[in-house]
Regions:
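Segments that shape or occlude catalytic/ligand-binding pockets
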Residues: 53-60, 66-115, 127, 131-166
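Single conserved position on a long alpha-helix in the C-terminal lobe of the eukaryotic protein kinase
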Residues: 119-121
Length: 166
């Protein structure tokens, strides 16, 4: 997993400036002109505009295809270098006037992964500008290890009579 400072630098924030602080819970926040970046100790990244006139994270236009590409590119930048097998895919697009939300979910070998806390990522646009982004920083990997759904004693208790645990 990449450090909060590395993620901040990847997004163009100065991780060594005076506008960086970490609270007692381990949440790190970076503030720079137009945006606030927060990375929680639990692995949730939030990027939000602190004014309405931002251009730093912006799509080419307000067209849906450009917004989706901007959101995908932003998420790709944040997750680059991850060795995880799961990937984020667009699963929903919500439009309400000038506001558009691109919703992404993690998929592992074509199977959706729904972490506690909602969708894998949500990128909110006002016009063509990103006004808020939320990403659950997760790394799902495939394994060949067999995992029991139930402990053996419980599994045996629900087996039909005459059956054996395999």
């Amino acid at each position: 997993a990449r450090s909060a400072d590395t993620l901040a630098a990847t997004l163009g924030f100065n991780p060594y400036g005076d506008a960086r602080y970490t609270d007692d819970a381990g949440n790190t926040t970076y503030t720079e002109t137009g945006y606030v970046l927060s990375i929680s100790a639990a692995g949730e990244l939030t990027l939000r505009s602190d004014d309405g006139q931002v251009t730093r994270f912006r799509a080419v236009s307000g067209e849906e295809s450009d917004l989706v590409e901007c959101a995908r590119s932003l998420l790709s930048t944040i997750t680059s270098g991850s060795a995880a097998d799961a990937r984020l895919y667009l699963t929903e697009l919500q439009k309400d006037g000038a506001e558009t939300v691109c919703i992404f979910d993690y998929f592992l070998n074509g199977i959706p992964v729904y972490p506690a806390g909602g969708h894998g990522a949500e990128i909110r646009f006002s016009g063509a500008s990103v006004v808020q982004a939320r990403l659950l920083l997760r790394a799902y990997t495939l394994t060949t290890q067999t995992v029991s759904v139930l402990p053996p004693a419980q599994a045996a208790a629900i087996l039909p009579e005459g059956s054996e645990l395999g």
